[in-house]
Each structure stands twice: as C-alpha cells, then as structure tokens.
Amino acid sequence: MKLFITGVNGFIGTHLLENILAKTDWEVDGFDIASTNLAPFEGESRFAFRKGDIFKDNEILEAEVIKADAVIPLAGIAKPAYYIKKPVWTFELDFEQNLKMVRLCAKHGKRIIFPSTSEVYGMSGDTELKEDESPLTTGPIVKMRWIYSCSKQMMDRMIMAYGQEQNLQYTLFRPFNWVGPRLDTLKDAEERQARSVTQMLYDIVYRRKISLVNGGEQRRSFTWIGDGIEGLMAIIENKNKKADGEIFNIGNPANNHSVKELAELLIDEAKKFPKFREAAEATELDIIPASAYYGKSYDDKQNRLPSIKKMESRLGWQPKTGMREMLYKTIAWYAENEAK
C-alpha cells in the first residue's frame, strides 16, 4: 500500500509514520511545510518527503494523490489558542485547503482517511458521545472558539456528501485529546500556544503557576498517542472493508479527568524525575477566568466522554494505557529531548 500524508511533520503524522515504517511494508510519501521532526526517518527507503505549502503547491498535491492508494490529510490547526487569535487562518486551512484534498481524492478515485475531531460534538448534551447519534451543537457566533468545530463538522458533512454523490471511499476518525511526545514544543508553551499537557509541563519545569481556566472543572478523555495510532492503523488496514463509510471515535473513556485532576496527576508524575522534583513540589495552581486567559470569545464544553463501542465492535480496538502511565511516558520524553 502507498499512502500520501500531509502534515507528516506534526504530532499525529510523525507517530503514524514511525508506526508504519516499524510494523508494515507500506510506503509513505509525506508533505509538510516543515521537517523539524523528521530527522529520525532520513534514509528510510519506504519514506519520501516533499517540503511544500498546502496553500500553494496544488500541482504537487495532485501528483501525490494520483500516486497513492490512500490519502491521510493531517495538515491543520488543532490548538484552541489559534481558534481565538487566528480564526480566518483556522478556517482556511482546516476547511478550504482540506476540501481541496477531498476533491482530489474524489476526482482520482482515491480513498481518504480524514481526521475529524472530538470538537465537532461541541456543546452536545449527550453524556456519552456517539458518532452517528449525538447532536453536534456549538455556541453563539460571538464565541469564536467554535470556528474550528464548525470547520471540521462541515468537512465531515462534505466528505459524506462526496461519498453519496461520487462514491468517494472514506473513513473519518475523531481523536479525543491524544497525548504523548511531540504534542507541542516547550517553545509553544512559552508563548502560551500549547495544549494543556505541554503547557502544564512547561509551567512545572520553569516554576510558573499552572493556570486552571474557570477552575479546571472541564473534563476530557485523555488518550495515549500510541493507543490512538493503533486505532488509526486498524482504520488504514481496513480489514473486510469494515471502516468504509464510517466515523470512529478514538479515545479512552477510562481516562476521563478534569483539567484540575490532570494538573495534579502531572505534578505527581513529574516528582518521579529527579531533575523536575523540586520544581514540581513547588508548583502552584492558579484559578483564572477564561476571559483572562483566552479572551471574551472563548467558550467550552464541560465534559467530553466518547463512546468507543464502534471501534471495539467493527475493528477490535481498545485503548490500553492508563492516565499515570501516559503522563509518565510523556514527561520522560520531554525530559530527554526538550527540558535539558
């Protein structure tokens, strides 16, 4: 099998590439605007990288789609800070540029495996979020945070529409707070542009207070990147075509914790590392309103708990990694690679 992956330099892209090269005989053509995380893959005979801009390099993108058996468009914005500060760019990249990829796959009869997001469920009132049943409800227009959710939801609908009208072969997957090495850089965290785990770890390492937006009572289902990638691999493999035309949540309901609990667990795990112990023991939690941290256009969902029955029944996938193990392994990577 030959895959074309955009955004291959990113968090999911690098972990997926690593897994493919280690466990399969598949070939990968990768495309991204940067290659900062790809040094370990230099010289791999089954991996070819093309540096480029998804906004501009249309001929390259089409040529790569034509060569591929399946396309995985991972290029996109997935950081809440950007939804607020750069909403137009968020829409242009997450919807407009990725719609271009969908249309190329439909035009050339290629399978697309597309990253939706748990954010599409928005403010859904369902306790357990189900792919084909839960309503997708977002907040008012003045809450700019929802532009990402709406962009992704519209993309899901367009992909399904192309499947209906032009027989596009597709699968959508919805990651629920995947965590692990390379989630963000500590430089991102220094600029307050990182996601929760990396931001908190930065605050611990550099002896800053951990900010708990609105008290950190929001609950999320945190998922080890390795477990998430195993689920994604099952989708790509697509045994007996059981993934065709389906949407799958990929998350870990057993790791459903509040953001405050996440901070407390991260501090506890950081204490196990001699280089971080003193800083972790001194770390304080600081409760601040969302408006002070993100601005007035922020909004949030109080709990996000996935149903993974579909992944279990159709593809035989279940997450394996508990919360403490996941955080320990994540801290260990940053201790070795970034927090020198």
Regions found by a protein language model. Give the residues of each.
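N-terminal Rossmann NAD(P)H-binding glycine-rich loop of SDR-like oxidoreductase domains
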Residues: L3-K23
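NAD(P)H-binding glycine-rich loop region in Rossmannoid oxidoreductase-like domains
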Residues: I54-L93
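Active-site "gating" loop of Rossmann-like NAD(P)-dependent oxidoreductase/epimerase domains
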Residues: I77-W89, E96, K110, P115-Y148, ...
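Rossmann-fold cofactor-recognition segment
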Residues: S45-K56
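Conserved glycine-rich Rossmann-like NAD(P)H-binding loop of the short-chain dehydrogenase/reductase
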Residues: D25-S35
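Active-site Tyr-X1-5-Lys
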Residues: V142-T171, I204-Y206
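C-terminal substrate-binding subdomain of Rossmann-fold SDR/epimerase-dehydratase oxidoreductases
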Residues: I204-K340
